[in-house]
Regions:
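A short glycine-centered flexible hinge/capping loop motif at secondary-structure junctions
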Residues: 204-208, 411-415, 452, 456
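Hydrophobic, lipid-facing positions within transmembrane beta-strands of outer-membrane proteins
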Residues: 122-130, 172, 271, 331-335
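Terminal intrinsically disordered/low-complexity segments used for targeting and assembly
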Residues: 2-67, 124, 148, 232-277, ...
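Short flexible linkers and secondary-structure junctions
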Residues: 17-169, 306-311, 344-351, 358
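Sec/SRP-type N-terminal targeting helices
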Residues: 73-74, 90-91, 134-162, 212, ...
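Short sequence motifs at beta-strands and strand-loop junctions characteristic
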Residues: 118-122, 327-329, 430
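Periplasmic alpha-helical coiled-coil/stalk elements that build and connect Gram-negative outer-membrane
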Residues: 140, 156-271, 382, 406, ...
Length: 474
């Protein structure tokens, strides 16, 4: 009983409200990212980021995915569901009113002595009833607030899905663009090697070259053709992936990347301390912590009594003609207090479970926040590395191409064997393809950075009941 009294006093002194515990800040260490061009500068708005690549088909594909992707539709349905459940929780704060009209017609036996003046009787009754639970300890308001946090979490989860889908579309499309470049490079190499094979065959027939040179040239041509087949397979797989992302069957989907060069934008990352407010997944994790903290507060109110007010009223009469007369009216008022005296430890277990749930949500929140910081830093690391690779492979591509031309000229004059030509040609092709792959990796790393920075998302400024009407266009 002393424990119950203490809980009652705590509930009264706490102004009868339940609020989530404030989140402790996540330590970010040094408030700057490595490889950031302007470490102290704020990150620019990323709204409309797909257009920054300067490719209209990319923007159109992202818009199509945001409109047709089924993962996004499922996430939107979860928001609608959370809003509906919020309505259920908020309804508990209002009184319930009901009506139970009835009509009975009965006949009394004529062979049994009774004092009733009539053997055939009618009973008309229309009683109304109302009940209202007084939210003394904030349990119902706390439960409604849990529903609001769930709506905000579902809305942030939807934004995270939209961002994931948009960036996956961008990554696959950009990869497809560079695969097309790779295919063009391989096609040129195959044409050159086919021509070289014809020249060598003529030299063999003239006795100026050996069969070994012809065999090496044929093997080199077949290797390039095998690489071409593999790149074509990759192109088809990317088109299929884009089809599914846009909500279309792969059997009826086509896409043709523009032939123009992709413009890879520079994306300043801003400050680590600001990043956590820009990520929808971090925001959703924080709302899960708030909801779990509220669950703990609501669970503790189970130790406190509940007060319910009831009221009845209406009319009842044997004759329909006198049904609405004053003497036919009836009413009643009441109040009840309920308190559980023994439940075998159920309430203690519920509080312990809710407390553990709060600790779990808090740990997940911190892991999500640290993961967000890592994703930004990893993307910056990739961008720095790919920029360096592009410089090196660009120089290597020019050098190896010149070496390949020189080697072919030397072979034509009989100064070197065809093995040297093959090696030089292979080096030139590898350098060209590595340059393409590095440019592709730079574009993908930039998309990864956009995703890691939240893609221009901002926390909702509207009520939870209206989050479905938010404009989340990228």
């Amino acid at each position: 009983m002393s424990r119950l009294a203490a809980l009652l006093a705590a509930g009264l002194l706490g102004a009868c409200t339940i609020a989530p515990q404030p989140l402790a800040p996540v330590p970010v260490g040094t408030d700057r990212f490595r490889h950031a061009d302007a470490p102290g500068a704020p990150a620019p708005s990323l709204a409309g980021w797909p257009a920054s690549f300067g490719d209209a088909p990319l923007v159109a594909l992202v818009d199509a995915a945001l409109a047709g992707n089924f993962d996004i539709r499922a996430a939107a349905a979860r928001v609608d569901q959370a809003q509906a459940l919020l309505g259920v929780r908020e309804a508990a704060l209002s009184p319930t009113v009901g009506v139970d009209p009835s009509f009975n017609r009965s006949r009394v036996s004529g062979t049994v002595d009774n004092a009733l003046p009539k053997r055939l009787m009618h009973n008309w009754s229309v009683p109304f009833n109302a009940s209202y639970e007084v939210d003394l300890w904030g349990r119902l308001r706390g439960d409604a607030e849990i529903g609001r946090q769930n709506v905000l979490q579902a809305d942030a989860d939807r934004a995270a899905v939209r961002l994931r889908v948009a960036t996956e579309v961008a990554s696959d499309y950009l990869t497809l663009h560079f695969v097309e470049e790779d295919l063009a490079t391989l096609a040129r190499a195959i044409e050159l090697r086919r021509t070289a094979l014809d020249v060598i065959a003529a030299r063999v027939r003239a006795g100026a070259a050996s069969d070994l040179d012809a065999l090496r040239a044929a093997a080199d041509l077949d290797t390039a053709r095998a690489d071409l087949a593999d790149s074509r397979r990759l192109r088809e797989n990317l088109v299929d992936a884009l089809a599914v992302l846009t909500g279309v069957s792969p059997t009826s989907f086509t896409v043709a990347p523009t032939a123009a060069a992709i413009r890879v934008p520079a994306v300043p990352p801003g400050l680590p301390s600001v990043l956590l407010a820009q990520r929808p997944d971090v925001y959703a994790a924080a709302r899960r912590v708030d909801a779990a903290s509220l669950e703990t507060g609501v669970a503790r109110t189970a130790w406190l009594p509940t007060l319910t007010l009831t009221a009845q009223g209406g009319f009842a009469s044997r004759d329909l003609g006198s049904f609405l007369e004053r003497n036919s009216s009836l009413w009643g008022l009441g109040a009840s207090v309920a308190e559980t005296l023994f439940d075998g430890g159920k309430r203690d277990a519920a509080v312990a479970a809710a407390t553990a749930g709060t600790a779990l949500a808090d740990a997940n929140y911190r892991a999500t926040a640290l993961g967000a910081l890592r994703e930004v830093q990893d993307a910056l690391n990739d961008i720095a590395a790919q920029n360096e690779r592009i410089v090196r492979y660009d120089s290597a591509a020019r050098s190896t191409e010149a070496a390949a031309r020189l080697s072919l000229s030397r072979y034509a004059h009989g100064y070197v064997s065809y093995l040297e030509v093959i090696d030089a040609d292979r080096d030139a092709l590898n350098a060209q393809r590595q340059l393409i792959h590095s440019r592709q990796a730079l574009a993908i790393a930039t998309v990864d950075l956009v995703r890691a920075l939240g893609g221009g998302w901002t926390p909702p400024s509207v009520a939870p009941q209206n989050v479905a009407q938010r404009d989340d266009r990228l």
